[in-house]
Amino acid sequence: MDKSKLFLKSKRSFRRRLPPIGSGDRIDYRNMSLISRFISEQGKILSRRVNRLTLKQQRLITIAIKQARILSSLPFLNNEKQFERTESTPRTTGPRTRKK
């Protein structure tokens, strides 16, 4: 058996991921369907590593998101969970005592 062939790895084919922004997509503050893909649940801008964008695309996305926020077509924060009504303990109507 030839020793040089023992250490060669078989070449596995892999499927290249499609870029999140196509060539026809315009990065614009009015394109809400595109912008919303790059925002987290809390309304934060996702990082470039998570988005798999180039540096130029990430910069353009960030500028578009900030413009949309300023023009109030996008909220700065998305904290609906913060204001949800939860089960609270009933308040007592007895006399109050001061702590000394």
Swiss-Prot record:
Any single biological process term in GO: translation
Keyword set, alphabetical order: Chloroplast, Plastid, Ribonucleoprotein, Ribosomal protein, RNA-binding, rRNA-binding
Record's keyword annotation contains Ribonucleoprotein: yes
Sequence ranges of Low complexity compositional bias: 89-100
GO CC terms: chloroplast; mitochondrial small ribosomal subunit
Subunit structure: Part of the 30S ribosomal subunit.
Similarity field: Belongs to the bacterial ribosomal protein bS18 family.
Protein's name in the database: Small ribosomal subunit protein bS18c
Species, as recorded: Nandina domestica (Heavenly bamboo)
Name of the encoding gene: rps18
